Amino acid sequence: MTALTQMKCEACQADAPKVTDAELAELIRMVPDWGVQVRDGIMQLERVYKFKNFKLAMAFTNKLADLAEEEFHHPGILTEWGKVTVTWWSHSIKGLHKNDFIMAAKTDQLLD
């Protein structure tokens, strides 16, 4: 995994800077399975995880909930039969912050 998994999220206030285009290009390479989506003008990171059944998808969702509480940074989560869609963005700045990439990397690590 990347060095992002060793980092902790920092408190993100409404005046915190969003990632720049250069930072985005660098950080997205560190979480290659994630894509950037824009919804309602807000840039977000998103990944769909596949599972063999609903129970495994739910177990992953619960591990992700624990991680989100530990870091005090919370994603959008859609749990369905055989898949979980995870979306990270920083609500306070209405866009992407380094925290979102840290959490994307840590979310990937939950599969190990």
UniProtKB/Swiss-Prot annotation:
Assigned keywords, A-Z: Lyase
Annotated transmembrane regions: none
E.C. number: 4.2.1.96
Stretches assigned to coiled coil: none
GO biological process: tetrahydrobiopterin biosynthetic process
One MF annotation (Gene Ontology) recorded for this entry: 4-alpha-hydroxytetrahydrobiopterin dehydratase activity
Family recorded in the similarity comment: Belongs to the pterin-4-alpha-carbinolamine dehydratase family.
PANTHER family linked: PTERIN-4-ALPHA-CARBINOLAMINE DEHYDRATASE-RELATED (PTHR42805:SF1)
Protein's UniProt name: Putative pterin-4-alpha-carbinolamine dehydratase
Protein species of origin: Shewanella sp. (strain ANA-3)
Native organism taxonomy: Bacteria, Pseudomonadati, Pseudomonadota, Gammaproteobacteria, Alteromonadales
